[in-house]
């Protein structure tokens, strides 16, 4: 019997979450103290809410846009429901590059969560949106590098992955410099979305913020993005640039 795309995605998501739960239970039984989970709490971080002015390498017009990147969770120390959102809204145009993830996270070792769930993604190009099953990890590496990495399987069986690395350098008690690096790869091309096989794109950002309060910090910075391989070829075929640098200014807040 042939399954529909929606049923395939639901099945893949269920398998991913089951695998996450089983592995998390096994690892936590070995590494984490079997104390009852803490009371339910919540946390929301608006890591980026910014105006961007992008200058493209191909000489196209500068583009002004609003960009956001948020994350939040509800739960205890060991079990959490995570929600991630990210997107770009040009001032002259519709919302694009929209990304929403809803994940179950389980603490498996100190500072590291194993996560699984579902994702909705609308690419920067004019291609169709897709739904994905997600399995990933999120936590703090040695020297307090923040790491988030995930693998995605779409409703059509397309496999891709994304990794992000960031660090917070305290210049003073209030001035903080935050470099951030992100990379996307795909196991096969998805022409409708303008995604090529292999390395798709990389992004590097550097933001300097001033914490008026810990919960509220305006910032300025720069960001650079470059597409590669088949993804760059698809972009050129649409008349788009393959890279560019941006000046950014925004606010970071949490509650």
Model-found features: residue ranges?
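Outer-membrane beta-barrel "beta-signal"
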Residues: 206-211, 241-255
